[in-house]
Amino acid sequence: QDWCKGYEYIDGFAGTGKPKTRDEETYVDGSPRVALDLQYPFTKYHFIESTEWRIRKLEEMKTEFPDRQIEIYPGDCNKMLREQIVPTLPRSSYKRAVAFLDPFGMQLEWNTLNEIAQTRAIEVFINLPVMAINRNVRRRREEDITPAARECMDRLWGTTDWTAEVYEEKQTLFGPERVRIKQSGKDLGRRFRNRLMEIFPN
């Protein structure tokens, strides 16, 4: 559209740009390369990656696309988004962006999503790390969750009330315990989606 001064692409967990498949024998195009190969390119690309060897791969890929404006941010996704990228994209800038957030685990923070939402200029696609959530916080008993996993989930969820979606109190032979709700995995994903819709109403 005529009023738009730029349409930018943000990849919060960029990886190498061409990761191996699970069989470790073939390579597939990762999200950065897919975005760069689009027929109608974005005006700017923001790739965030925290692992050094993956950053080197992204730098190599950058040389393959000399006509693309590519910025690589070495570091934590939340920090890079909140401090370096999101502030450059207020709605008043007349620039718009799409952010693809596909974390390997529970690194994403709700505060980051909230800051993105407040711009009203960035469309977000999130791949919720369901496997990481199931592995780390959907234990048989709430007391089995490690402090580190609990902290990660608190940051991802934005509050501590996610436990009410996963655990309920039941009487056992050893007294009352907070135990996992049978369908809590699906319920947790549904509730997270609903919370996203509250801050991204459109």
What are these regions (language model features)?
Residues Y7, K95-L101:
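Generic beta-sheet signal
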Residues L38-Y40, I116-R120:
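Short, conserved loop/helix-junction motifs that constitute active-site signature segments
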Residues M106-Q118:
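A short, conserved alpha-helix within the catalytic core of class I
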Residues T51-R54, P103-L108:
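Acidic, metal-coordinating catalytic cores used for nucleic-acid/nucleotide bond scission
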Residues R120-R135:
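Conserved beta-strand signature within the Rossmann-like core of class I S-adenosyl-L-methionine
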Residues Q1-Q84:
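SAM cofactor-binding core of SAM-dependent methyltransferases
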Residues L81-S92, N114:
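Short amphipathic alpha-helix with an adjacent loop that forms part of the alpha/beta core around
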